[in-house]
Curated annotation (Swiss-Prot):
It catalyses: dTMP + ATP = dTDP + ADP. Phosphorylation of dTMP to form dTDP in both de novo and salvage pathways of dTTP synthesis. One of its GO terms (biological process) is dTTP biosynthetic process. GO terms for cellular component: cytosol. This is Thymidylate kinase. ATP binds at residues 20-27. Keywords: ATP-binding, Kinase, Nucleotide biosynthesis, Nucleotide-binding, Transferase. Belongs to the thymidylate kinase family. The keyword Plastid does not apply. Its EC number is 2.7.4.9. InterPro entries: P-loop_NTPase, Thymidylate_kin-like_dom, Thymidylate_kin_CS, Thymidylate_kinase.
Length: 230
């Protein structure tokens, strides 16, 4: 099995992923964080999953239309997500990190663990194998998990969607979304060194301040301390 070579961490940028249920406010918070990072004179790249690169965006359209259910169910869907991630990481994320950019990504492999693993009935062995092929030992420097009551999140998503038809995941039953929230909370508890669980049931600016504090304490201040001691 092919293993990805790690990027030289002394030269690379930083990789921050955003996770959470529907309507948690990921897109808004990514935009607000990007503005703060750019104000701090840090080059940023905003992207998303599934998608981000031309090949992955094509797969995204098929996934959100529900093609996974048509061609084989949860396992087929997991394979499509893996194909999209491989293209995304290889053609967009890794080159940006190598250039020293800060990459902000709307969803990453934690969403795969939640949607396809815990709630999609895909075996852990298959997910681990796909993860090894697509990203190897690569991990985000920080994962922001936006936590919000399910009913509030779905109401926000409905307002955002307007008259458009709900996508493949927004159409799931309420119990699915409750389970999803619990999985993300479990991930945050299991990996506190990587994850910051943020209460997203507040005004966007207040949530943004909480995220900025996590970024500052976990990434910016350690980097500055390291630069001074070098």
């Amino acid at each position: 099995m092919v293993q990805k070579k790690p990027i030289n961490r002394s030269l690379r940028g930083r990789f921050i992923t955003f996770e959470g249920g529907e309507g948690a406010g990921k897109s808004t918070q990514i935009r607000l964080l990007a503005k703060r990072l750019e104000k701090a004179r840090l080059r940023t790249l905003v992207t998303r999953e599934p998608g981000g690169s031309p090949g992955a965006e094509a797969i995204r359209s098929a996934l959100l239309a529900g093609i996974g259910k048509l061609i084989g169910g949860a396992d087929a869907e997991a394979l499509l997500f893996a194909a999209a991630r491989d293209d995304h990481v290889r053609t967009l994320i890794e080159p940006a990190l190598a250039r020293g950019e800060w990459v902000l990504c709307d969803r990453f492999y934690d969403s795969t663990r939640a949607y396809q693993g815990k709630l999609g009935a895909v075996s852990l062995d298959l997910l681990n194998a796909l993860q090894q092929v697509t990203i190897g030992d690569m991990k985000p420097d920080l994962t922001v998990i936006l936590d919000i009551p399910v009913e509030i999140g779905l109401a926000r998503a409905a307002v955002r969607r307007g008259s458009e038809t709900p996508d493949r995941f927004e159409s799931e039953a309420i119990d699915f979304h409750r389970g999803l929230r619990e999985v993300f909370r479990q991930i945050a508890a299991q990996e506190p060194e990587r994850c910051a669980l943020i209460d997203a049931n507040a005004e966007p600016e207040e949530v943004a301040d909480r995220i900025w504090q996590a970024v500052r304490l976990r990434l910016l201040e350690p980097a500055r301390a390291g630069a001074k001691s070098a």
